[in-house]
């Protein structure tokens, strides 16, 4: 039998059979949970679809609402991880963060951070709209408003700074540190830009190294 559960709200724990140490607060929070344990859901429809998974935390209306069997996820914010179904060990903090995610080990902090991510794994995005177009790209790190915001399928980019790598879509293995660094880069790979506006205009030029404020800022397609 279920034990040590705390529930308050319409349909909370309606299907619970043997799950322990769960907390559900809000209409339909943890409504379909059967055997999962150590879950916390606060908000209307929070973790509504969860059935057997453990160690999930969802705070906010619809947070983690579609999650069924994914474990060890944290969703804080309205619609955070809202339609995610099976992903595990994800952290989404901010409205709509990781909203459609199904992959594992992603961290998104900020309004709409990684909102479009589906199967991309092992990403870190911090900042409003950070990596928000990413769908399948993995092992990317972005920090700053709209950093890597156009990235869709590229892997292994590191982008730190306001609008750094803003336009990048499929370029991989780039490093951009600084305000507007590699801002216009779209498909080029293996660039390193350190400094405000370093390689800012670069679009398709690959294998460049630019260190310092405005370093190679006008370079577009060349390799230096």
Q: PLM features: residue spans?
A:
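Glycine- and small/polar-enriched repetitive beta-structure motifs of secreted/surface proteins
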Residues: 1-224
């Amino acid at each position: 039998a279920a034990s040590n559960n705390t529930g308050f709200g319409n349909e909370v724990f309606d299907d619970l059979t043997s799950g322990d140490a769960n907390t559900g607060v809000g209409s339909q929070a943890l409504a379909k949970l059967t055997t999962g344990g150590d879950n916390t859901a606060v908000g209307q429809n929070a973790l509504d679809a969860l059935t057997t998974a453990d160690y999930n935390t969802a705070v906010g209306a619809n947070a983690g609402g579609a999650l069924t069997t994914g474990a060890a996820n944290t969703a804080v914010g309205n619609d955070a991880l809202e339609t995610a179904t099976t992903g595990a060990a994800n952290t989404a903090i901010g409205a709509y963060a990781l909203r459609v995610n199904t992959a594992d080990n992603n961290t998104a902090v900020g309004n709409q951070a990684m909102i479009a991510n589906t199967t991309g794994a092992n990403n870190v995005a911090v900042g409003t709209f950070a990596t928000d177009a990413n769908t399948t790209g993995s092992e990317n790190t972005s920090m700053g408003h709209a950093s890597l915001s156009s990235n869709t399928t590229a892997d292994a980019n590191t982008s730190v700074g306001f609008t750094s790598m803003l336009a990048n879509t499929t370029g991989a293995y780039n490093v951009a540190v600084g305000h507007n660094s590699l801002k216009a880069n779209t498909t080029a790979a293996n660039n390193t830009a350190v400094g405000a506006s370093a390689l800012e205009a670069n679009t398709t030029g690959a294998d460049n190294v630019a260190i310092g404020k405005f370093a190679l800022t006008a370079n577009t397609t060349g390799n230096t």
